């Protein structure tokens, strides 16, 4: 599937506060060009979040309806969830700490300190924690915000640049020498993660994209001599 950058930028441009946050992010984030945890990854998450927001507003089979304020919290959380990511140099606990510090600095820079901003920071920080890996929050314990952020963090694997962006991006960040092992572990992670998806959007997207994804994944393995992984 293709990443619709226009949809993402349209929502950011139309909201002055999100626009300020995005400008802060691009000016202060030192991980924009990491092999995997980069700007493209973050924009890919935001696209899925926007789609979930739009679907929740127009479909009757959704158990929730997101308001514009919910969307802003989710976009802000996605924007900063990998802020100043270490790219494999440190644990994800450190990465999440960096993300929260970046978010706090952004909010204080734009708004100053107030009870309202402290509350916004608290909500976004808790949401961001859902992406710390290995996961520190069980799937069954996720709040709606946390579930949306975690599932969108995983759904980026369905973009057409998956092989070059995620497989080789992660390999470079992790300094991985055993591509066969990474190939197998990545498959196991994705299949397990997709089975745990609970959002209607995530389930439908996986159903529509899984055949293409798995076919490409197995062809990639065959080309490199890894063999086929069972579906």
Sequence positions of predicted segments:
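Divalent metal-dependent phosphate-bond-processing catalytic cores, especially two-metal-ion Mg2+/Mn2+ enzymes
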Residues: 1-8, 36-37, 50-68, 80, ...
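Histidine- and acidic-residue-rich, metal-dependent catalytic cores
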Residues: 42, 49, 95-138, 187-194
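Exposed alpha-helical structural elements
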Residues: 4-7, 17-24, 119-123, 127, ...
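Acidic/His-rich, divalent-metal-binding segments that scaffold phosphate/diphosphate chemistry
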Residues: 1-90
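Short capping loops/turns at secondary-structure boundaries
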Residues: 69, 76, 92-96, 117, ...
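Short alpha-helical scaffolding segments that buttress acidic/His motifs in well-ordered protein cores
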Residues: 21-26, 74-80, 124-132, 148-152
């Amino acid at each position: 599937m293709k990443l619709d950058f226009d949809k993402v930028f349209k929502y950011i441009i139309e909201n002055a506060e999100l626009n300020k946050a995005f400008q802060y992010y691009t000016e202060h984030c030192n991980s924009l060009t990491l092999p995997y945890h980069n700007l493209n990854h973050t924009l890919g998450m935001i696209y899925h979040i926007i789609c979930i927001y739009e679907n929740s507003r127009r479909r009757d089979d959704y158990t929730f309806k997101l308001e514009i304020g919910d969307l802003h919290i989710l976009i802000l959380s996605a924007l900063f969830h990998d802020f100043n990511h270490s790219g494999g140099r440190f644990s994800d606990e450190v990465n999440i700490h960096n993300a929260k510090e970046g978010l706090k600095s952004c909010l204080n820079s734009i708004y100053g300190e107030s009870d309202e901003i402290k509350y916004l920071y608290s909500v976004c920080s808790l949401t961001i924690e859902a992406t710390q890996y290995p996961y520190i929050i069980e799937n069954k314990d996720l709040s709606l915000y946390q579930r949306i952020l975690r599932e969108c963090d995983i759904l980026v694997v369905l973009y057409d640049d998956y092989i070059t962006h995620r497989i080789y991006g992660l390999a470079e960040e992790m300094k991985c020498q055993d591509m066969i092992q990474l190939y197998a572990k990545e498959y196991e992670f994705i299949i397990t993660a997709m089975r745990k998806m609970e959002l209607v959007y995530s389930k439908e997207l996986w159903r529509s994209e899984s055949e293409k994804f798995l076919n490409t994944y197995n062809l990639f393995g065959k080309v490199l001599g890894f063999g086929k992984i069972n579906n």
